Amino acid sequence: RYTIPNREKDMTEADGAAPRPEGATQTAAKRARRRAAKPKAEAAPQPPPATATQPPKPPAAEPPRPLNELIMEQTAESLSALSANLTQAMTRANQVFSTAFIDQTKDAATWQPDPLGMQVALNDVWSHLATQPETLRDAHAKLWERYADIWQRHTAYMLTGQQPDEGPVRDKRFRDPEWRSNPAFSMLRESYLATSEFITDLVEKAEGVDDATKRKAAFFIKQAVDAASPSNFLMTNPAALRALFQTGGESLLKGVENLAKDLKRGEGMLAISQTDLDAYKVGVNVATTPGKVVFRNRVFELIQYAPTTETVHEVPLLIFPPWINKFYILDLQPKNSMIKWLTDQGHTVFLVSWVNPDEDMAEVTFEDYAREGIYAAVDAVEKAAGVSRMNTVGYCVGGTLLAATLAHMAKKGDERIQSATFFASQSDFKYAGDLLVFSDETGIKFLEDKMDQAGGVLDAQVMADTFNALRSNDLIWNYVVDNYYIGKQPPPFDLLYWNADQTRMPKELHLFYLRKFYRDNALTEGKLTMMGETLSLKDVTIPIFMQSSKEDHIAPAQSVYRSAQAFGGPVEYLMAGSGHIA
């Protein structure tokens, strides 16, 4: 946790490493010193602590059986059943893929071979690498040295049976013990990791390639490398093979049916199920904190939550969540609902629920969302609560809109918002991470075409696919293995249910957001004009709290920290653990 010094900060430092919190004041240490300076009363005597009865530990799960044992136990009867189920699975898979192909060809006229400019970026990288023979020589020498080491160690392993000590498993793709205990799988795993590191390192070592091109090439190389992992193929995944032999092929039959459901739900495109979508219902077992809609216009509904304390704080709290997905990210279930926690602390909580737009809202703009969203919500809270000041929270893109509107309010002398808290929200987009790959003019034109095809809105699945690609191992390939190869049903998970409850976005709003923020970084550079005013975050002098997360891949911590430096008043910055939403 850091306090950002209230001083002018040069926001145009030379390209290089992103800024980190340097020389910042640790406010926790200050509070500790203040507490230490106060006289303390003598502690009252305490009874000795009771001896807690430790609950019995649950029995450890049995390790999965080695594949060799399962294969050796197969009988003629079991192999016959396995063969029959495999034949049935292949027949059904052919039907599923044929149906999906027919569904996809309905939009064949709009297909583009390389809509995001992947090949152009890769060609640029390879052409520059071709002029670096020493780099290529050293990289290949290192690769063959690793191959030789892998071969030598695994030959010794097969001859002696002594498994090499490799430390803890850090890559979740290879958590099955067979990836280490079986020399063949172990060698395959290590060879893949060596090769993937060789390829990705080459991209990084290409000289003379601009940052945007290198970022795009690195992103798509990583997608290809992740897809090529041996864990993603039935015949080279020990967990999938184990399930195949243990169930006589029924696991694959179930997996094909799971695949069929997801392709049907995606109308020919793969819409991967990440949770049990039938396990939750809004207002029944998610988003259950009592409240009512107190205002509505074409852009949003305003929910006021019922108080749970006898008295409440005078100043209400107004929350602006992202318009990507639904409003209840902060109100999943009572045990993890921030909304419930806030009302239990005596806060009067208002929350904006953005509209899920249709084609009629294609021309609605970012400025409309500021005027009819932020300003209208502030007016409505002022009327409902009977007060002329309030605290605010902006989450993700909701925070970006809030920051821009605060700058406009400062220009107009509107002082009704007395503080702002930002969760995983960027105002500066120079270091905005892999989403910058989709935010050059090539990517924006591709999305614009997609929105035109959809009648002027960005289809929810397009945004979901983009976010999944940012973490493909966790959000794509993990489910390919579990759902389609092993035949598991994804378990209920409230957060992933919310993640799957997607919304559309108006065309003009989204294009403005991509061009002005991701591409041009106009807000922090003082070049964003809204409602007739050129905005500057230095005009925003109210207290600001900025929360980032260490593993956030959508609003990277370094980007949020840079955003914190853009405001003109006191700012406290906190980097938490975990990722964008968990």
Protein language model annotation of sequence segments:
Residues 1-301, 312-313, 350, 563:
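Amphipathic, low-complexity, repeat-rich surface-exposed segments
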Residues 119, 239-294, 450-536, 542:
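Alpha/beta-hydrolase
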Residues 209-242, 383, 387, 405-510:
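Alpha/beta-hydrolase-fold enzymes
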Residues 313-323:
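Short beta-strand element of the alpha/beta-hydrolase
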Residues 361-385:
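Alpha/beta-hydrolase active-site loop
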Residues 546-548, 552:
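Short beta-strand/loop motif that positions the catalytic acidic residue
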Residues 553-559:
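Conserved alpha/beta-hydrolase "acid-adjacent" motif
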